[in-house]
């Protein structure tokens, strides 16, 4: 049975020596692969995994930083918009004040011009009345002198005119 046990169905026998050498060679090959190929390969794979994890962590940190930056930008934009609105409101208030001041100054200037014009009118009126009084007195003297056929002095004439003007003014 030993002779039959060493033969397989196809009639080939097992050679234990060759099998042992093949097995030892295979084990040596596995050890060499583990030492020279698997170790460096595993090291490369571990480094790659660390790099990927680091890249993921960096990406997450960058995302967090981007969110913070976006929030800061929104806050800055809001502050800027508020500041612009305040500047616009202040400008409107200042414009209203200037408008009121300009109107006030224009009214004061117009009132001053009106007062000046009224003073000028009153002054001219007084001059005109004085001129008319002088002319009336001259005419009165002329008429009176023709009527009386005599000349009266200038002082008497003025007193007479003033007397008649006062009497005319009282009526």
From Swiss-Prot:
SUPFAM superfamilies assigned to the protein according to its UniProt record, in alphabetical order: F1F0 ATP synthase subunit B, membrane domain
Location(s), subcellular: Cell membrane
UniProt keyword terms in alphabetical order: ATP synthesis, Cell membrane, CF(0), Hydrogen ion transport, Ion transport, Membrane, Transmembrane, Transmembrane helix, Transport
Topology of the protein relative to the lipid bilayer: Single-pass membrane protein
Keyword Calcium: no
Keyword check for Ion transport: yes
Top-level lineage group: Bacteria
Gene Ontology CC entries for this record: plasma membrane; proton-transporting ATP synthase complex
GO molecular function, one term: proton-transporting ATP synthase activity, rotational mechanism
Assigned protein family: Belongs to the ATPase B chain family.
Quaternary structure, from the entry: F-type ATPases have 2 components, F(1) - the catalytic core - and F(0) - the membrane proton channel. F(1) has five subunits: alpha(3), beta(3), gamma(1), delta(1), epsilon(1). F(0) has three main subunits: a(1), b(2) and c(10-14). The alpha and beta chains form an alternating ring which encloses part of the gamma chain. F(1) is attached to F(0) by a central stalk formed by the gamma and epsilon chains, while a peripheral stalk is formed by the delta and b chains.
Protein name, as recorded: ATP synthase subunit b
Encoding gene per record: atpF
């Amino acid at each position: 049975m030993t002779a039959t046990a060493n033969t397989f169905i196809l009639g080939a026998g097992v050679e234990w020596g060759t099998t042992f050498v093949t097995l030892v060679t295979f084990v040596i090959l596995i050890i060499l692969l583990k030492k020279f190929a698997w170790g460096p390969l595993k090291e490369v794979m571990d480094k790659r995994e660390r790099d990927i994890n680091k890249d993921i962590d960096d990406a997450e940190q960058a995302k967090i930083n981007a969110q913070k930056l976006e929030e800061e930008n929104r806050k800055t934009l809001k502050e800027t918009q508020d500041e612009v609105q305040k500047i616009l409101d202040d400008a409107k208030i200042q414009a209203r004040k200037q408008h009121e001041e300009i109107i006030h100054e224009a009214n004061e200037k117009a009132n001053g011009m009106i007062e000046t014009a009224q003073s000028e009118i009153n002054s001219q009126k007084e001059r005109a009345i004085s001129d008319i009084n002088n002319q009336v007195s001259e005419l009165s003297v002329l008429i009176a002198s023709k009527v009386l056929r005599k000349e009266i002095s200038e002082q008497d004439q003025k007193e007479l005119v003033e007397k008649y003007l006062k009497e005319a003014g009282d009526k």
